[in-house]
Amino acid sequence: MKNILLSLIIFYRYALSPFMGNHCRYYPSCSVYTQEAIQRYGGFRGGWLGLRRLLRCHPFCPGGIDQVPEIAKWRSKS
């Protein structure tokens, strides 16, 4: 699953993104963020972090620098 998701992100970045323009309000871009999250945490957790990031990336969001969090910062407390 991890490799399939990473392949889709790479396809998006090189085949679709050049035609859509650079509109991401965050650094790193949403595709780079999601790719790093999936590589670090796997398909499910990394995909969830990427989806949350995509939902935050809209015209009314101020954006800024948003790195992939360390696991201790976003894991639920027990």
From Swiss-Prot:
Cysteine disulfide partners in this protein: none
Keywords associated with the record: Cell inner membrane, Cell membrane, Membrane
Localization, UniProt: Cell inner membrane
InterPro entries xref list: Membr_insert_effic_factor_YidD (IPR002696)
Keyword Cell membrane: yes
Principal location: membrane
GO cellular component: plasma membrane
One Pfam family recorded for the sequence: YidD
Topology versus the membrane: Peripheral membrane protein
Keyword Methyltransferase: no
Family of this protein: Belongs to the UPF0161 family.
NCBIfam families: membrane protein insertion efficiency factor YidD
Function summary: Could be involved in insertion of integral membrane proteins into the membrane.
Record protein name field: Putative membrane protein insertion efficiency factor
Organism (species): Nitrosococcus oceani (strain ATCC 19707 / BCRC 17464 / JCM 30415 / NCIMB 11848 / C-107)
